[in-house]
């Protein structure tokens, strides 16, 4: 099995799902401390948002994607029946995490979870655009941050900095997904250049976070 193969069980899928699904909410969690809002990390919250983000990005998104795409392209995955069973277990875990953190930190957690569920409907016949996964990355950062602080009542400058980092996540993920799907775009040079430009533009918001 080649590393770059696509599908739920592909090594490439697992690695990239961890990078996006687990590390982006970790970034959000670290922001809360870096901005001086919290004095100690809510460790349980960090673990759960990283776990939830990883499961959502890897299992939720890819069971749905593989179910609709296994007859369209070659994918390293399970049977359709196994995918549905795995999807069911995945939903139980994710809903449990969302409910628990909502009880611990407030209703916005559930809103972020619902957004995550919607953007995971990534397949032909459903939603199928790079932007939706980019929005997922954006809200993973915001969600990770919120779980740490537990409130929306923060100074406007704090939210501006959080939004800057979230837009960095959005654009970097969008640019990466365009590059990842170059084969779907028949290796269009315009799409390749756009992905590079968007990824570079993401750095502007990363820099803004540190200079504001």
Language-model-detected regions and their locations in the chain:
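Membrane-interface loop-to-helix entry segments
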Residues: 127-135
């Amino acid at each position: 099995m080649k590393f770059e193969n696509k599908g739920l069980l592909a090594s490439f899928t697992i690695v990239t799902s961890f990078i996006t699904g687990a590390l982006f909410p970790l970034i959000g969690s670290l922001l809360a401390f870096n901005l001086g809002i919290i004095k100690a990390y809510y460790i349980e919250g960090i673990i759960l948002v990283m776990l939830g983000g990883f499961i959502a990005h890897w299992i939720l998104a890819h069971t749905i994607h593989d179910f609709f795409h296994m007859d369209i392209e070659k994918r390293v995955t399970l049977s359709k029946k196994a995918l549905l069973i795995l999807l069911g277990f995945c939903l139980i875990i994710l809903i449990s995490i969302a409910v628990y953190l909502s009880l611990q930190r407030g209703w916005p957690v559930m809103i972020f979870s619902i957004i995550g569920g919607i953007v995971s409907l990534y397949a032909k016949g459903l939603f199928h655009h790079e932007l939706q996964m980019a929005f997922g990355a954006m809200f993973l950062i915001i969600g990770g941050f919120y779980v740490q602080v537990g409130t929306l009542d923060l100074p406007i400058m704090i939210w501006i900095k959080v939004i800057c980092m979230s837009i960095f996540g959005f654009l970097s993920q969008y640019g990466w997904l365009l590059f990842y799907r170059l084969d779907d775009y028949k290796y269009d040079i315009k799409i390749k250049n756009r992905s590079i430009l968007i990824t570079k533009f993401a750095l502007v918001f990363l820099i803004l976070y540190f200079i504001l």
